[in-house]
Curated annotation (Swiss-Prot):
Residues 1-22 have a biased composition (Basic residues). GO terms for cellular component: large ribosomal subunit. The keyword Ribonucleoprotein applies. It comes from Rhodospirillum rubrum (strain ATCC 11170 / ATH 1.1.1 / DSM 467 / LMG 4362 / NCIMB 8255 / S1). This is Large ribosomal subunit protein bL32. One of its GO terms (biological process) is translation. Keywords: Ribonucleoprotein, Ribosomal protein. The keyword Transcription does not apply. InterPro entries: Ribosomal_bL32 (IPR002677), Ribosomal_bL32_bact (IPR044957), Ribosomal_zn-bd (IPR011332). Residues 1-27 are annotated as: Disordered.
Length: 61
């Protein structure tokens, strides 16, 4: 069974974990209605994506 030869220092452990932090979600403005929306997602308020209406407005709202 594999066993560590030396104790991992706090510095090495923390450097390894430096990429584990949560990043804030990215949001952009919908060009159709101006509401905030996630990139590469259909706008939840107006149902538009890439300049086209993909979801009808009564379903989106």
């Amino acid at each position: 069974m594999a066993v560590p030869k030396k104790k991992t220092s706090k510095s090495r452990r923390d450097m390894r974990r430096s990429h584990h932090a949560l990043k804030p979600s990215a949001y952009g403005e919908c060009p159709n209605c101006g509401e905030l929306k996630r990139p590469h997602h259909v706008c939840t308020s107006c149902g538009h994506y890439d300049g086209r209406e993909v979801v009808s407005e009564d379903v989106a709202a």
